[in-house]
Amino acid sequence: MNAESGKPTHLTARELIDAVLDAGSFTSWDVPAPTAGASATYEEELRLAREKSGADESVLTGEGLIHGRRVAVIVSEFRFLAGSIGSAAAHRITSAVQRATTERLPLLAGPASGGTRMQEGTPAFLSMVDITGAVRAHRQAGLPYLVYLRHPTTGGVMASWGSLGHVTVAEPGALLGFLGPRVYEALYNEPFPSGVQTAENLFDH
């Protein structure tokens, strides 16, 4: 939370990882994200997103230590196309969850996303099913899955891996929900009720 404005701050994925894990303990599990088959327009959007964010995709995965204990982490990079999840990002998340299950590691997730990636349409939305299945298998293996909802977490991300934690906490003031206010206003031509989709309101109700 920004002390001056009272609004949530956008930590980068690496800033959050560095704040949570023991210093110097993070090891990435990520491999280069494929872009084959993307249209020229989408490829340019991906290039600009990589340039802006310094990341190759909208999520970073890996492992590190917390007080010396191994944990797996999945953290959104919101500056990469608003943290949206396409097929490459979904595959990265699913692979990380499956590896955490195989290696019997607790899993920490820090989503911050506008949802699935509109440039990829239905396949991106359906990829949430794979992520959800992997998370359920991790939970069924008796392993902790902890979620820190960051500002904002909406759409298919909130409806899938953002909502499956054994323990879920949220950034103060975070916008959380399925249908974001701007989408609601575009659909219904009226403003979304103020304060409904905040972390505090969801906690109270």
Language-model regions, residue ranges each:
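Intrinsically disordered, low-complexity segments enriched in small/flexible residues
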Residues: 1-58, 63-65
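Glycine-rich anion/phosphate-binding loops
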Residues: 45, 52-58, 83-98
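Conserved mixed alpha/beta catalytic, RNA-binding, or beta-rich assembly cores of soluble enzyme
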Residues: 78, 85-94, 110, 124-127, ...
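A structural preference for short, pocket-lining loop segments at secondary-structure junctions
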Residues: 66-77, 92-117
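A generic structural signal for short coil/turn motifs at secondary-structure boundaries
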Residues: 81-85, 117-120
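Glycine-/proline-rich flexible loop or hinge segments
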Residues: 43-45, 74-82
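Conserved catalytic cores of soluble enzyme domains
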Residues: 114-205
